Structure formats: structure tokens, C-alpha cells
Amino acid sequence: MNKIKIYLDTSVISYLDQQDAPERMKETQEIWELFKEGKYEVYISDVVVYEINQCSREKRETLLDYLDQIEYNIIETDEGTVELAEKFIDFGFLKRKSYDDCRHIAAAILAGCDFIISWNFKHIVNVKTIRGIKAITTYEGYKDLMIYPPSALLEEEEEDYGSDDKRT
């Protein structure tokens, strides 16, 4: 059986060590365990690598150490990624100032990912962006890309494997 392909934007990796958001940090760490177990096929792009490299030395080293814990594929963005990212702006559901977010989404679509997970509710995980992405993928003939916060993976795991809830 093929594993679900999941694209991680930088916010997911960053929240592994986000002391000022303990609940999201805990959820992200739980999801990271699933990645370490190899339950999903994980993707990041060179945009993620670039954004991590913009962090302070200490934060950058911490995030790279986390990445070393899992298997992942790196998507190299190219002209096709840029063209698709530009369409998101042209269609008006993302703005030019969110260009890197557009590139994350475009990279995930072009790599054939099933999901992109992100803690970025302002630009990625919101109704306007999700509807816009659906319109573009349908119009351009790409596979649908589902966009969720990382916590949705925990909910899926509970459904797949049952919970500890013993209600009858």
C-alpha cells in the first residue's frame, strides 16, 4: 500500500521547538513520532531549507537536528513551481507578500503530495486559500491537495487505530 505523501511547510518544523505555544508544540512532537516511524512519505522543499537557514544559529541547528530524525524528500523548486505560484497571486487568493507560501503550495502540488500540513492559518490553512487551491488544481488538471493543520493527522491516527475511549 502506498504511503500518504505529506508536505511540511516550515511552520510545522518550527513548532517542534516553540516554547511559547506548548499545545501546538506537543501536537507537532506527537506527529513527528509518526514521521519517525515512517507512517507517511514526507516532503519538504528548498523553500523550507531556505527559511530554516534564515533562523538564528541555535534555532537552525535545532530544526536541522529534528529533520535528521526522519526520512524525507526534498523538492527542488523550478520554473514550473514559480509559474504555479504566480497563478495563486493572479487569481487573488494569496498576495505577493505571501510568495514563499505560494511556492510551498505549488511545490506540494507539483510533487503529487496528498496533503500539506501547516500551522500558518493566516496564509495557508484557511477557507480562501483552500478554495482557491481547489479551483486551480481542478482547472489545471492537478491532483487535489488537501490542506490541514498538523493536528488533523492525530485525528486520522485515532480513527485508523482506535482510541483509548472505552465507551460502548
Which residues fall in each region the model found?
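Short secondary-structure boundary segments
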Residues: 10, 46, 119-121
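Generic structural signal for residues in well-ordered beta-strands
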Residues: 42, 74-75, 147
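Short, catalytically relevant binding-site loops at active-site mouths
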Residues: 48-51, 80-82
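Active-site neighborhoods of divalent-metal-dependent phosphate/nucleic-acid chemistry enzymes
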Residues: 74-131, 154
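C-terminal end-helix/capping segment
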Residues: 125, 129-146
